[in-house]
Structures are given as C-alpha cells and as structure tokens.
Amino acid sequence: MDRQQASPLAALTALGRLAAQLEGVSERRRDGLLDWRYHGRLVARQLDDTHVVIRATFEFRDLLLHSFPETFSVPERFAEHMMIVADLEHGNGDAVEDAVIAAWELQSGK
C-alpha cells in the first residue's frame, strides 16, 4: 500500500517498524496510545487514532509546515514547544517517516 494513502492504523504500524530500526528507540503504550523514545527522550507520540506529535527543531518544523501543509500542523498547545503534529489519515506518509527519523537524529545527536 502506498504510504501516502495508508490507513492511520497502517501508518502507525509503519512508524512502529521504522522506530524498531532506529538505534536506541523503544516503543511503549500508555493509556492505549503509542510512543517512541530514545533512551527516555521523546521522539514521537500518538495523540489519537489519526495524529502523532513528533519532536522537531523550530527551523525544521517551519520547513515541514511550508512543504507539507496537508500533513503537518502546530496546534496552539504546541506553539511554544519543539513539536509538530502529523495527520496520519490525510498526510504524506513518507514526510511523516522523514520527520520521525529527524526527531531521532535530534534526540540521539546523530
């Protein structure tokens, strides 16, 4: 299935597979929602059935917002934080995966 048209569940599964390949990243479930952490530091976290929040520098966040406005947003509650929200239902799966890899690089210093 094309990641640009994957269901949110398929997108979460793909993120889990990706996270498993990133050195030092572990997946866990809290209150029924997934999160992925690098040695305890947040990489990405599921917000609901169709959205994940991903760690991102402010500069990279701005780039993602301008390049993929259908995929990424910054709700008011994340405006002051180095975080961006990805829409798994309507967004570009490749862009989401790239953002997760960038978050891992940020947290791991790679």
Tell me the role of every PLM-derived stretch.
Residues 1-110:
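Charge-dense, helix-prone N-terminal extensions
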